[in-house]
Amino acid sequence: MKKRGQFITSCLALMVLMTVALVGCAKATEAPATTTAATEATATTEPAAKKPTVAFVYIGPPGDGGYTYQHDQGRLYMEKELGIKADFVENVPESADAERIITELAQSHDIVFTTSFGYMDFTLNVAGKFPNVKFLHASGYKTAENMGTYFGKNYQASYLSGIVAGKMTKNNQLGYVGAFPISEVIYNLNAFTLGAQSVNPDVKVNVVWTNTWYDPTTERQAAISLLDKGADVLLAYQDSPATLQAAAERGAFAGGNDSDMSKYAPDNYLTNPVWNWGPYYVKAVQAVMDGTWKSEQYSGGMADGMVELAPFGNKIPDDVKKLVEDAKAKIISGELEVFTGPISDNQGNVKVQEGQKLTLEEVLGMNWLVKGVEGTIPQ
């Protein structure tokens, strides 16, 4: 690849960033120009001669306060640790636009991270056209020789969040704002419910699906609908703090997802799962630099620090904190597996037998709701 003049490159990059800021969530922009010439990716058996060029594709804005924010914090961590400046494109819809942008990034980068489930097939398509580029897709399950996946057992932290919710409710009615009825959201909803039931067998969890990852207005409306139905504690599998903010206005407790959201309503905050992507990004990019990278389906968790639990809100009692910390220690040690039988679905069918522990593959393919969840999975 020919190296572009620094002045021209900087101008192009600035123009792209300005375009991204203007269009916001309406439409993804062209991929940003590279700040240095991209080197050809080397075979996995030979170390890279130069530091690789890296790009990220984001579903939302880095300022969403949740999922994309945490990925962007991981990018910044990787840049600091490895001395690499990475490009990113934000607000990329899970549509043909994604494939176009991933393709453009692959033309000028050695490593492309695509950070949302809906990018899976688009990433796979582009990977087939650029065999010398490494692609890493978050939360998916399809791989290729030059494409791996990565995600974590965030359901472990959802279970712990459920313990807090189960202890803080006064009427045993919990609410859950879910993005899409896909396995990733379903197993987190189920884990949250099981955690709550472990300390309060009488709780019920009502779920509302928003069919969006990031739309604060829609998320807020879903939260209000749950509060109107009587829920006094909420958790959201969404990318913004809108659920927490809506709950706080009603004097209810709530937790968010992906990031520490306590600053938005510290007196109404529970806790929630938090992603720590930075160390993984360092590991993956370093492997490419060392020539040791190989395609894999990486799944982290609380034990390796990819998944964490946010600090507790101001009003969480010490005895509740201790319950959570004790369960957390058991999860990290392996003594506590979230999906251990007996577990029945909300139709009365036994899905996990007494003493049985679901494998990771079974968890990732979950398409049923546990007993206690009031709602259905839309078809």
What are these regions (language model features)?
Residues 2-12:
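Bacterial N-terminal signal peptides that target proteins for export
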